[in-house]
Amino acid sequence: MAKGEGAESGSAAGLLPTSILQSTERPAQVKKEPKKKKQQLSVCNKLCYALGGAPYQVTGCALGFFLQIYLLDVAQKDEEVVFCFSSFQVGPFSASIILFVGRAWDAITDPLVGLCISKSPWTCLGRLMPWIIFSTPLAVIAYFLIWFVPDFPHGQTYWYLLFYCLFETMVTCFHVPYSALTMFISTEQTERDSATAYRMTVEVLGTVLGTAIQGQIVGQADTPCFQDLNSSTVASQSANHTHGTTSHRETQKAYLLAAGVIVCIYIICAVILILGVREQREPYEAQQSEPIAYFRGLRLVMSHGPYIKLITGFLFTSLAFMLVEGNFVLFCTYTLGFRNEFQNLLLAIMLSATLTIPIWQWFLTRFGKKTAVYVGISSAVPFLILVALMESNLIITYAVAVAAGISVAAAFLLPWSMLPDVIDDFHLKQPHFHGTEPIFFSFYVFFTKFASGVSLGISTLSLDFAGYQTRGCSQPERVKFTLNMLVTMAPIVLILLGLLLFKMYPIDEERRRQNKKALQALRDEASSSGCSETDSTELASIL
């Protein structure tokens, strides 16, 4: 398992600089090294890069919380509201098809886009920036049309399915190259880590912003629940007209207004990213004539031990946090009885996460990333146990929400901070292959979305077996118990499994420092005017 991991990193750090930098044929190279290390990003550059993460989070949060209720209650013509059994409206089955197909397509597009990016040539704008530039107009158009109710009776399901899948494709064409851009904004590990901390702060704020904008503008669209003849509680569509403060048409306009605001945020953030960030090419990469073939690169990436261990560990921890996220509103509403407080609890979690991301950035710089993983993610366990055992208490629930936000911040920051270390390690072992960065990032996003789909399926099936009543004001005790397990016990088990896998992750702080020295020697050798293919062959043999 670990036959040569320590030895390989040691040789990369020790033999590489000695064999290359001490060459008597290039004595001036050592004198140039201090200047090459000054590749710091300004705060403005980091903010411009960080703002590029907001569109994905703002739109994803709005769709995640509101698309289902929009398809069921709003995506129909005015005359169909009264005749709630009209065959022309988007019913629950059609809505489930739209949501499932859209989510599945979203996961599939990540490796497909990664494939296309890996084959993209380097242009005057870079390799990644053209994807961000040309996907933005199509993404905002598709997003706006998702929230538009077409004025024709037939084919509404196809309308929403088309534009939902189109938007997911375009936002993937934006987000995958944006994620891979981390490797090209700077060659310094510390600068990339700092920029990642800025990015995670903005992305957490983006989730808060998406929820706030959509919730405040379309909050009137919520349907109340009523008691039926069997003493169970169901929602009434006609109640929207009796108890709502806006008409159905005004509700549709409210969704369009919210979409327009979010589209403006998307465009502004994309423009700032494009104008404020310059994609930098590695000197040693420029010597290669063309990128590695995709499937060969995929085989090399998937055989890279640190990457597999990293994504497997985060797959379990991501699944844990997504189970909590997907069932938190239902848990607060039915198990804890805080129907009117869940919005504020969500806000407490996200604000806590936003405020603590800089603290985690300092922590991982001071104590190392593996230590930050253990401390940050495991800190959620005692609070989940407390939630499982305590009685319904609003003050304690708020305290737990704030504490949970601290762990959420670590879960947001650490994967994106550790992925560049894995890619650096890969580049040292495969110095002649480039263009694999989109593969690393796209497959990490793919596995994250896979975890999201699994958590959604597990939750839905579990609640269905427990007898969940759709849109009920209360639920049977079995449903409350199931929600308790989904939000507390199941995530605890998954977190412990993930932390166990992280024990096998080989890149610690010492290995990171060794890799940094070896990469710097590789860059200096490649950028030197006297660099030859003989030296590159020597470098590959040493590594």
Curated annotation (Swiss-Prot):
Effect of residue 57 to E: Does not affect lysophosphatidylcholine (LPC) transport
One annotated GO molecular function: fatty acid transmembrane transporter activity
Membrane-traversing stretches: 41-70, 95-115, 128-147, 158-182, 190-221, 242-275, 307-333, 345-363, 368-389, 393-429, 440-466, 479-502
Effect of residue 65 to A: Abolished lysophosphatidylcholine (LPC) transport
Cytoplasmic side: 1-40, 116-127, 183-189, 276-306, 364-367, 430-439, 503-543
Effect of residue 449 to A: Loss of plasma membrane localization. Loss of cell sensitivity toward tunicamycin
Matches recorded under Pfam families: MFS_2
Record flagged with keyword Transmembrane: yes
Effect of substituting residue 468 to A: Abolished lysophosphatidylcholine (LPC) transport
Effect ascribed to mutating residue 57 to L: Abolished lysophosphatidylcholine (LPC) transport
Glycosylation sites recorded in the entry for this protein: 230, 240
Annotated S-S bridges: 225-473
Annotated keywords: Cell membrane, Disease variant, Disulfide bond, Endoplasmic reticulum, Glycoprotein, Lipid transport, Membrane, Primary microcephaly, Symport, Transmembrane, Transmembrane helix, Transport
Protein name: Sodium-dependent lysophosphatidylcholine symporter 1
Organism: Homo sapiens (Human)
